[in-house]
Amino acid sequence: MGRSLKKGPFVADHLLRKIEALNERNAKEVIKTWSRASTIVPEMIGHTIAVHNGKQHVPVYITEQMVGHKLGEFAPTRNFRSHVKGDKKARH
């Protein structure tokens, strides 16, 4: 179930303030955030936001196609390191 339209998308206040400040002075800086639940809004297009994945900040360049998605979708938290090819121990 989606969020009510009358409420609007969730964006962390501190993140939105930083984006608006950068847009006012036409600056391009990397913004660090832990707010993976924030929705990407059109004001963020063209900015690079470093989203925390639990270990480090992953830089995410915001494009037009990302609007409406959450920041956390673009910073994977799990790293799959493929199965060992010649592992004979697993099979008996």
Curated annotation (Swiss-Prot):
Disulfide bridge map: none
Under the heading Gene3D superfamilies, the entry gives:
30s Ribosomal Protein S19, Chain A
Q: Name one GO molecular function term.
A: rRNA binding
**InterPro entries in the record, alphabetically?**
Ribosomal_uS19 (IPR002222), Ribosomal_uS19_bac-type (IPR005732), Ribosomal_uS19_CS (IPR020934), Ribosomal_uS19_SF (IPR023575)
Q: Which Pfam families does UniProt cross-reference here?
A: Ribosomal_S19 (PF00203)
Give the GO biological process terms.
ribosomal small subunit assembly; translation
> Looking at the UniProt record for this protein, which Gene Ontology cellular component terms does it annotate, in alphabetical order?
cytoplasm; small ribosomal subunit
- What keywords are annotated for this sequence in UniProt? Ribonucleoprotein, Ribosomal protein, RNA-binding, rRNA-binding
Q: What family is this protein classified in?
A: Belongs to the universal ribosomal protein uS19 family.
Protein's job: Protein S19 forms a complex with S13 that binds strongly to the 16S ribosomal RNA.
Q: Which HAMAP family match?
A: Ribosomal_uS19
Record-given protein name: Small ribosomal subunit protein uS19
Give the species: Thermosynechococcus vestitus (strain NIES-2133 / IAM M-273 / BP-1)
